[in-house]
Regions:
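Catalytic cores of NTP-dependent nucleotidyl/adenyl transfer enzymes across multiple folds
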Residues: 95-151
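Conserved catalytic core of two-metal-ion nucleotidyltransferases
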Residues: 61-95
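Canonical hydrophobic alpha-helical transmembrane segment
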Residues: 167, 192-216
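Short, intrinsically disordered, charge-rich cytosolic tails of integral membrane proteins
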Residues: 218-245
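Helical scaffold of the NTase/Pol beta-like nucleotidyltransferase catalytic core
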Residues: 1-21, 144
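Interfacial non-cytosolic loop connecting adjacent transmembrane helices
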Residues: 176-199
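Catalytic metal-binding acidic patch
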Residues: 29-48
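Juxtamembrane interface helix immediately N-terminal to a transmembrane segment
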Residues: 148, 152-170, 175
């Protein structure tokens, strides 16, 4: 189904579409999902949708809903009782698009998070079968916490590498400043000026990256703490009879 719809969407959007991707639970093996496929279409500019919207409005299978709160245009295919696709049209440079792709990739590559998300969806489906607002709110809390946690963790590593390199640069510059003997006055002064700049800029970068690392660690710590609280609550709920799998 996805491959067929993908081909049709490329025909509809043409060069306005930069990327079309399968997202949502149906894109992840092992996750419970409704038989509705979520697709995201990334445009260079969301306003470009106006150039192709007539192709959807002229087809009775499609209906359009502009969701400016989420920076997207939602195109639904199929009727209320026979919904087939949710097509999320977004600006490729928007935070919303980056978050959607990042969360999908996290579920694809992080088995523990994928399993925790599966348990959450199972509980919410049973707990709020007719309350879409509550279901979405609880799921959004998990997604936002996961994004914050994983982003901070993956960013912290490169920041620490930069801190290490800048520290080594400062040490080498400091050593050159005071330890390298030069007989010619010109070369001595040149090395002194270069080493002074190396010490200064290396030190500034080191202190900046250390400060950024502390902020990232604190952000990761808080997100991880909240994530564990959500997971612990889920595990407790799963022991109850009405929520058991």
């Amino acid at each position: 189904m996805f491959a067929q719809e993908l081909e049709e969407l490329w025909d509809y959007f043409g060069d306005y579409a930069i990327r079309i991707s399968h997202i949502g639970s149906t894109a992840i093996d092992g996750l419970e999902a409704k038989p509705i496929i979520d697709i995201v279409v990334a445009l260079k500019d969301l306003d470009d949708f106006d150039n192709v919207s007539h192709k959807f409005t002229s087809n009775p299978e499609y209906s359009i809903k502009k969701d400016f709160d989420n920076d997207e245009i939602l195109v639904r295919k199929g009727g209320e009782r026979n919904r087939k696709f949710y097509i999320h049209v977004m600006d490729i440079d928007s935070k919303r698009y980056r978050d959607v792709i990042f969360f999908r990739d996290t579920l694809l590559h992080e088995e523990e998070i994928r399993n925790d998300y599966r348990d959450l969806k199972h509980i919410l489906a049973k707990k709020y079968p007719h309350n879409r607002k509550q279901y979405t709110a609880h799921k959004a809390d998990f997604i936002e916490t996961t994004l914050d946690m994983v982003w901070a963790k993956t960013t912290l590593g490169p920041i620490l590498v930069i801190a290490g390199v800048s520290l080594i640069t400062s040490i080498i510059a400091l050593w050159a400043r005071f330890s390298v003997p030069y007989s010619a006055e010109f070369y001595r002064l040149r090395v002194r000026d270069i080493s002074r700049a190396g010490i200064f800029f290396g030190g500034v970068i080191f202190l900046t990256t250390i400060l950024a690392s502390v902020v990232l660690w604190w952000r990761y710590h808080n997100a991880k703490k909240h994530y564990k609280e959500i997971v612990a609550k889920n595990k407790k709920e799963l022991t109850k009879g009405q929520y058991k799998k």
